[in-house]
Amino acid sequence: MTTGALPCCFGGQTMKLEGFGIFVKDMATMVRFYRDVLGFEIKEDENTSNVFLEKDGTLFLLYRRSDFENMTNTKFHYAEKINGHYEIALSVENYSAVDKTYSEVLEKGAKSVMSPTTEPWGQRTCYISDPEGNLIEIGSFVK
């Protein structure tokens, strides 16, 4: 039996996760939210069709929907309101930091989806959404 992760290779090349992105309708609003509310660092000009942000070494791309559709010559359908297709998971130091961070991001304009609660598996967690309804979890396993 093998333990640990096996490297994934394609044509002799290793593939690794560098970051992730979401397609956005209102670039300015979304840049402000991730920068000012959640503390992401902007890595390039924020007035382009895609904006790279970074949080703790992970790249996070905001890509303007209309520009992507023009590039691919395809019309896509997007979720409205709260989007339950995925979450962006952020961790904080401990249980009390979950509560404090939740209060702070609500004061800065995040929308509450679920207030802090301690789950049976030992995680204290809460959910907020960004201005376009993407779910964001803030949690910790440290009491």
Question: Where do the model's predicted regions map?
Answer:
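Vicinal oxygen chelate
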Residues: 8-18, 41-129, 140-143
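Residue-level signal for the nucleotide or nucleotide-sugar donor/cofactor binding architecture
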Residues: 22-25, 93
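Conserved beta-strand-loop-alpha-helix junction that forms the acyl-donor binding cleft
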Residues: 24-27, 120-121
